[in-house]
Amino acid sequence: MRMNLKKLIINSLFLAVGVVLNQITPPILFGMKPDFSLAMLFIIILLNDDYKTCISTGVVAGLLAAAVTTFPGGQLPNIIDRIVTTSLVFIALRPFKDKINDKIHMIITTIVGTIISGSVFLGSALIIVGLPASFKALFITVVLPATIINAIVGTIIFVAVKKSMRVVFRQ
């Protein structure tokens, strides 16, 4: 029970930090902002071995993203996006967990995960509310730059989280 409570608290803190960073970060490159909540979700997926923890975190991340979205009508697409992304990233990248370096794993997870997330978000938004431009145009101008930014920022945060967890939990 204690381990589950500790895991729940840590995951909640990561999600909260991701949402706060999303809100206070100004655009960096051509109006693009790193999606800190998505980066934190990927960190949680890498730090947790069980699917139940990851999918419940994905649901909460979707609800938080829906609450703070700036995309018109993006609430439901955000929820769908986070749940699908969490499931696919967990399943697809789990076999490589102990076979590659943590930093490389985070870079791959962030790149693959952001592309999945952006595709699912745009696809579900297209079906549910429509898009202000074509899927292809939005994918090229929004998702691909966000993928690069998230890979860099997510890896930096991941390294900091791993170091701080080693100090705090003396691992």
From Swiss-Prot:
It is a multi-pass membrane protein. This is Probable tryptophan transport protein. Keywords: Amino-acid transport, Cell membrane, Membrane, Transmembrane, Transmembrane helix, Transport. The keyword Cell membrane applies. The chain crosses the membrane at residues 9-31, 58-80, 107-129, 139-161. Coiled coil: none annotated. Belongs to the vitamin uptake transporter (VUT/ECF) (TC 2.A.88) family. TrpP subfamily. It is found in: Cell membrane. Probably involved in tryptophan uptake. One of its GO terms (cellular component) is plasma membrane. Its main location: membrane. One of its GO terms (biological process) is amino acid transport. The gene is trpP.
